[in-house]
Amino acid sequence: MIYVECKADKSLVHVIADIRPYEIEHCPGKNEVLKKLLKDKKSIGIIDEDPNASSPPELKKFKSRKSKLSLKFYYEESNNNLLIIICPNLENWIIEASIEGKINLNSYDLPSNPVDFHNIINLNITKFQNLLHGLLKKENERLLTLRECIENYIRNGNCPHLR
């Protein structure tokens, strides 16, 4: 199972990885993602870092393993769970991916301001999904890294970024 904190995260996982929608569960906030993850085995949680917010106490049960492309990878050994933290948050991460891929957000009717971007993708998830497909066509390294980790962990219980 993959636990995420918002519908945009759910769309991200569904679009970039070969994961069925029923294998992705939307939880109301990062605390709930972590609680669900700690009750499950061999699962993945995806949350935003949100550096200005306080860290949930459950985060202490996960060990930091590696960081790559503004993704932080954590591991919880007792239940064999993976936690992926998107830094600083999904909106900024995707905007940066678009800049790196030389994708004009205006061509997807999306703003480059993270707050406005957040509001728009939550009102019209299709625009966000179209952007994700555009990033994948350009073989964006951020999305490919996240995809590789999710798919490998679900299939083999192994993420190359935990080593």
Show which residues each predicted segment covers.
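Acidic active-site catalytic centers that drive phospho-/nucleotidyl reactions
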Residues: 5, 9, 48-50, 91
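C-terminal accessory helical subdomains adjacent to catalytic cores in phosphodiester-
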Residues: 15-19, 36-44, 51-163
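RecA-like P-loop NTPase motor core
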Residues: 1-44
